[in-house]
Amino acid sequence: MAFSPKESMASRRQALGLSALGLTSAFGLVACGSSADNASSSASATPSEKPKYAGKVSVVPENEATEHNPTHPATVTGEEGTTLKSVKLVNDTTGAELKGTLSDDKITWTSSEDLEFDTQYTLTYTAIDSQKVEGKGESTFGTVTAANQADAWIPNVQEGGVYGVAQILEFHFSEPVVNKDAIEKLISVTGKGVGEGKIRWYSDTVARWRTEDYLPARTAITAKANILGVDLGNGMIGNSNLVVNFSTSDKRYALADNNTKTMQMFVNDKLVNTVPITLGNEDWPSVVGKLVVIEQEATYKFDPTTLGLKKGDPHWYEPFTAHNTSRLTNSGVFVHQALPSAYAYVGVGNVSHGCLGMMPADAQYFFDTFDVGDIVETVNTGYPMADPDNGYGDWNIPFASYSDENYKGDW
């Protein structure tokens, strides 16, 4: 049977359509068959694991460290190819984040802001190992507590004070100083014309400083003890630097001579007054040597019991209030106005218990002219010197022997 052209075209389209469908299906089956094979292959293989962080980081202070010296920075350091991405150091008390610096090679981070004493800190970091895998870490530590801190101060010199040129600088420490040589290097006294000084230790907590000659007159002076963060010994850490600024007055010197029963007063090496005095009696002779005015009071109550005297003792005297007093020793040697009962002996004989007594006008003159830190030297009493720590008898020690704690003078 023959086909018409119209039918023939339609039949061809149908045949081509079926043929195309068959090809598509065939490709589809092939594709489906290939996917199935891959799925089966993947199912039978071991799945790949995510790389683990293998970096190495060292932290100072170590985790949970205590009594860390706050003057020493906290550091984080990457090792064996590990670098640092970020570091954060936080004060646990205030929540404040401390500043720090990351090295250019990103290996080391160092805190650049001062830590505080007796404070807990938390340090966190993100690091990257040699395989570029990130990891995180955390460390906590505490700084030196109050029980292990040490202070320094100068009790006999106040900030902004004015003192005589013979003033001794006495450094006190709240804890025993074991590392004396190291601490001495941290003590300085500076000012125009101030000479080289030496230090003498009177105990593990008290050290005095002086020069060979007196301090220069009318000079601004700064005394320091830079002990912040320094171990004084036994793990006691200095918690601050000591700085005291003061100045000196005119050079004032007094010479009390038992032979003449007089006191000569000098200001800037010029004699300004000579006055009669009474000194200590035979049983209580005045000590000789150079002593420094420790303190001054317009009035001061004298009590014989402080000398170990009791009523009935031949040296007993009734307590009295002295005027225009300048203390020279801790044990009770003063320059002061004599009692009316002693006026007749001033310039003639000795009736005191070691003090230097004057007539009222002369005592007033001394009190108004002299000040703390000025020098008073007594001679020709036939009695030894006062111990150097009974007041400030340091000027009686030869400068060459001043640092020798075993040196024993005439006291």
Describe the role of every protein-language-model region.
Residues S86, L186, T262, T325, ...:
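Conserved beta-strand and immediately adjacent loop positions that scaffold enzyme active sites
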Residues V165, V288, P304-W411:
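Exported/periplasmic cell-wall-interacting domains
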Residues S203, A207, L255-N258, P285, ...:
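Short, glycine/acidic-rich beta->alpha junctions
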